[in-house]
């Protein structure tokens, strides 16, 4: 067991809590508004508290956790949608995730916690690759995502856009050594993690107390990906023999 705790926003049927318990992390609470997914997660994670609508939550009053995860609604970012971007009613809920993280950290600091002890220390965000190109002007939404996450611990942070004509890369990182802050993102395809279809998603990890985010997202996940590919080969071989 790692002793780590996590909260899941936009929880759905509990993808983040499932990953958490498989790695010794305790899912403490989840925010979801749809009845069926809540029933599913209550069955699989009976000890996880359901806290309700994200827009009605106060991060300072939630049980503090070391990790806050969330895949904010993707409909306004997806290339298959109308592409209202972060200004859209659904995908704009990303800002609620930022608000809750800020409120929880402020409450912890008011209790006297500092440095790596301030919760949450980590934030994970997941979304569709369309987030790289959505916005007005084009590519603006992901710039805002990066900037707002930096502002959790660097209030006056400014994030420039990508190089003209290039767009955002599929993987990248930000290191702010003077603030002990790091952020990394990469686009992963679920076909390499045991799913029988192509399903690309952006995964972004922020570390508000050190420069470890790239190490966790790149090095640690590469080891897991290699393990997943080996397991997938074994499964394929078994299916072929049967």
Regions found by a protein language model. Name each.
Residues 2-6:
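Extreme N-terminal starter segment of soluble prokaryotic enzymes
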Residues 8-14:
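Class I SAM-dependent methyltransferase "Motif I" SAM/SAH-binding loop
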Residues 15, 19-26, 44:
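A short, Lys/Arg-enriched amphipathic alpha-helix followed by its capping loop at the start of a domain
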Residues 30-31:
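The conserved SAM/SAH-binding core of class I Rossmann-like methyltransferase domains
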Residues 65-71:
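Short SAM/SAH-binding signature in class I
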């Amino acid at each position: 067991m790692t002793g780590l705790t996590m909260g899941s926003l936009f929880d759905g049927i509990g993808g983040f809590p499932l990953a958490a318990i498989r790695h010794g992390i305790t899912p403490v609470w989840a925010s979801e508004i749809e009845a069926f997914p809540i029933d599913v997660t209550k069955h699989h994670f009976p000890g996880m508290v359901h806290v309700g609508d994200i827009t009605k939550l106060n991060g300072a009053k939630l049980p503090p956790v070391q990790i806050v995860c969330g895949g904010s609604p993707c409909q306004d970012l997806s290339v298959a949608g109308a592409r209202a971007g972060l200004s859209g009613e659904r995908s704009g809920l990303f800002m609620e995730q930022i608000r809750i993280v800020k409120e929880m950290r402020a409450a912890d600091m008011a209790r006297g916690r500092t440095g790596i002890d301030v919760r949450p220390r980590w934030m994970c965000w997941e979304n569709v690759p369309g987030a790289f190109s959505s916005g007005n002007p084009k590519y603006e939404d992901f710039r805002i995502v990066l900037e707002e996450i930096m502002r959790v611990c660097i209030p006056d942070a400014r994030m420039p856009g990508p190089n003209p004509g290039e767009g955002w890369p599929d993987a990248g990182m930000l290191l702010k050594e003077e603030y002990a802050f790091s952020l990394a993102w990469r686009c992963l395809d679920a076909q390499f993690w045991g799913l029988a279809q192509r399903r690309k998603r952006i995964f972004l990890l922020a570390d508000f107390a050190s420069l470890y985010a790239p190490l966790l997202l790149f090095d640690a996940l590469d080891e897991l990906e290699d393990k997943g590919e080996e397991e997938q080969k074994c499964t394929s071989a078994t299916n072929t023999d049967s």
